[in-house]
Regions:
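Mobile active-site "lid"/loop adjacent to the S-adenosyl-L-methionine
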Residues: 7-35
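Class I S-adenosyl-L-methionine
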Residues: 57-104
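Conserved beta-strand signature within the Rossmann-like core of class I S-adenosyl-L-methionine
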Residues: 35, 41-53
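Alpha-helical scaffolding segments of alpha/beta enzyme cores, especially the outer helices
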Residues: 34, 38, 66-69
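S-adenosyl-L-methionine
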Residues: 1-7
Length: 104
């Protein structure tokens, strides 16, 4: 896929919920960071990328921290990166959003 092609990219990290879900089948830090980096590359100006990371399972915080490290390193002249969370509850999902600024 070429760069500047996509308006919205969404990631929902963790494992498939439900009583029969295999909690070993889940997203992993290394592949998630690679996928998010690819998503950022294909965002067109004005596009948005979101990542919802769940921190209540093994490896969840590490995965969110790795994504935060990646988006924190984006050029602020080209991107705005934010993190939203509920601060009065434990292990709440983190919503990370990246907006690629419009070109002038």
């Amino acid at each position: 896929m070429e760069t500047d092609a996509v308006g919205v990219v969404c990631f929902n990290l963790g494992y498939l919920p439900g009583p029969t879900a295999d909690k070993e089948v889940r997203t992993r830090r290394t592949t998630t960071v690679s996928a998010v980096a690819s998503g950022v590359r294909v965002l067109r100006p004005g596009g948005v990328l979101t990542v919802v990371g769940y921190t209540g399972h093994e490896g969840g915080w590490e995965e969110v921290e790795a994504v935060m490290e990646l988006v924190s390193s984006l050029d602020p002249r080209e991107f705005t990166a934010t993190n939203h969370s509920v601060v009065n509850r434990d292990n709440c999902p983190q919503l990370i959003a990246v907006h690629r600024k419009e070109t002038k």
